[in-house]
């Protein structure tokens, strides 16, 4: 799988992320993708070949392996990374759409466009507010959901996070209960616990970032509400002054007309 392309795409999202989001991307790249590519694929590369059962019954070994490992650990982690990274791509698409609209306004010569050239639009960092805030917050929520679902699926599918040394299988077509052995169970257990721990750290970072965004959102709303409370009073004063001026002008005009008619 081409993880470099995924890193390039998510690297663009890093520019528009919060500080916590940048830490999450760092953990994702270094402790998950790099470990998955460099080490985990080698550890699980021989899992089916070195899965040994003490029977010569044709098909028994394959059935037992499928029973204990319906999905390979390495493939499940790769699928998890794809699902967890997909919401961040929504943010990248939203930013690309905003940038495209800015470029279109610039080319049309719109007076509302405050940019000097296309390069300034291309390198602009958008603030997380408005519709981008909703997109970014929804992406974090779905990341949390995907992380939690995959951790539960992992625990449920493999009956825990430890790799047993001995597995007893009695599935058909095995003639009786046979003993099956996994290669490098301790090493695989260490990698499994490490990946689960990193996934838990990512969940905590997502929760912290979600709380941070919600706090900023409500503070911004309360600040706007406070400004709106003071702003109407200011508008009322301005309207009162304007009405007084209009009355003075109206009275002066009436006096002028009366004086003109009387003369």
UniProtKB/Swiss-Prot annotation:
Query: Tissue range of expression?
Result: Exclusively expressed in the cochlea of the inner ear, where it is found in cells of the tegmentum vasculosum, cuboidal cells, supporting cells and clear cells.
Q: Which GO terms describe its biological process?
A: cell-cell signaling; gap junction-mediated intercellular transport; sensory perception of sound
Query: Membrane topology per the record?
Result: Multi-pass membrane protein
Any keyword Transmembrane helix? Answer: yes
Instruction: Please indicate which superkingdom the organism of origin belongs to.
Output: Eukaryota
Any keyword Transmembrane helix? Answer: yes
Question: Which Pfam families does the record associate with it?
Answer: Connexin
Describe the family membership recorded for this protein in Swiss-Prot or TrEMBL.
Belongs to the connexin family. Beta-type (group I) subfamily.
Report the protein name in the record. Answer: Gap junction beta-6 protein
**Organism field:** Gallus gallus (Chicken)
What gene makes this protein? GJB6
